[in-house]
From Swiss-Prot:
Keywords: Hydrolase
Sites annotated May be catalytically important: C155
Organism: Xanthomonas campestris pv. campestris (strain B100)
One annotated GO molecular function: GTP cyclohydrolase I activity
EC number, UniProt record: 3.5.4.16
Name this polypeptide is given: GTP cyclohydrolase FolE2
Record-linked Gene3D superfamilies: Urate Oxidase
GO process terms (BP): tetrahydrofolate biosynthetic process
Pathway per the UniProt entry: Cofactor biosynthesis; 7,8-dihydroneopterin triphosphate biosynthesis; 7,8-dihydroneopterin triphosphate from GTP: step 1/1
Length: 311
């Protein structure tokens, strides 16, 4: 003899009648198949799945249905088309709740193998935090891709102050001399060229782009390379001395305030995406606080200040 298991969400009405904008689950651990992921093609992700609950008298949604749909769909390689199918399946599974909207979020790190700046055949792994958000409402799907890119930033003002100190030191040590041999100047610079080091630091750019309808893939690597090319000083993995020297040269040739970094990214993104947002943060080596800048394509007048996360 089998007894029917109780389902309170179905059999008992809500004591307080009110529609709910979103109901679901977050921080679901799940593997994601990603063609761009190296070396295995699978990444460990954290997922959020939610639907709306417009019927005010219903006590709750069917959480297990959402979990099973997420699990089943993510057996396929991740793509915009697959996420669109998942969103529609989530809505269809809650027809008895009157649901008309669904949203999914996936957060993970993708590992990309990047070559050294100069050393032939040398490469190393770099991890890039990624977030993908997808939402469907009234038959219309929207998708957004977000990545974090680490880079080095060197303060233009600090570099100018350093050059001034070097110039003064050279003038003081060679006062009264009317002619200097090139090799003597070169030797002096070799000994004293780092009289003062401008303050530089690791920095992060968080870039978010809205994807156009019917896009075939997320193409995470392409967005990473676009951002790193715009900034010109991405952090490195495997390096030898020749690569470290090349990195120093790049930093010296690309001095930038936080404003410069944001504008560089804006210029490149505006040529390829109709809708995007950029938030850059420099973990200042001189100060006990960070420098930040934001830009984007949207026309919103008011934005909440982003929550700070220590690095």
């Amino acid at each position: 003899m089998s007894a029917t298991l109780p389902d309170i969400a179905v059999t008992e009405p809500s004591a307080l009648h009110a529609p709910l904008r979103w109901v679901g689950m977050q921080d679901i651990a799940i593997p994601v198949r990603l063609d761009e992921a190296e070396p295995s093609g699978t990444v460990a992700a954290r997922a959020q799945v939610q639907v709306d609950l417009p019927r005010p008298e219903l006590k709750g949604i069917h959480m297990s249905r959402l979990y099973r749909l997420l699990d089943r769909h993510l057996e396929q390689p991740l793509s915009p088309a697959m996420l669109s199918q998942l969103l529609q399946a989530m809505i269809d599974s809650h027809a008895d709740c009157g649901s008309r909207a669904a949203r999914v979020s996936l957060a993970f790190e993708v590992m990309l193998r990047m070559p050294a700046l100069r050393s032939e055949g040398l490469a190393g792994w770099r991890a890039y935090p990624v977030r993908i958000d997808a939402q469907s409402r009234a038959g219309r799907s929207e998708m957004r891709l977000q990545i974090d890119v680490l880079y080095a930033s060197t303060c233009p003002c600090s570099a100018a102050l350093s050059r001034q100190l070097l110039s003064k030191a050279f003038a003081q040590q060679h006062a009264g001399q009317t002619a200097l041999r090139v090799e003597d100047v070169a030797q002096w610079l070799q000994r004293n060229g780092s009289y003062a080091t401008p303050h530089s630091q690791r920095s992060v750019a968080q870039v978010r782009v809205d994807l156009v309808a019917r896009v075939q893939s997320f193409d995470i690597r392409a967005l990473v390379l676009l951002c790193e090319s715009a900034l010109a000083t991405p952090v490195q993995a495997a390096v030898r001395r020749i690569d470290e020297q090349a990195f120093a040269r790049l930093n010296g040739a690309n001095l930038m305030y936080v404003e410069d970094a944001a504008r560089r990214l804006r210029k490149e993104l505006a040529e390829r995406y109709a809708s995007f947002h950029v938030a850059v943060r420099h973990f200042e080596s001189l100060h006990a606080h960070d420098a930040v800048a934001e830009t984007g394509s949207d026309a919103d007048v008011f934005h909440m200040i982003a929550e700070s996360h220590g690095q």
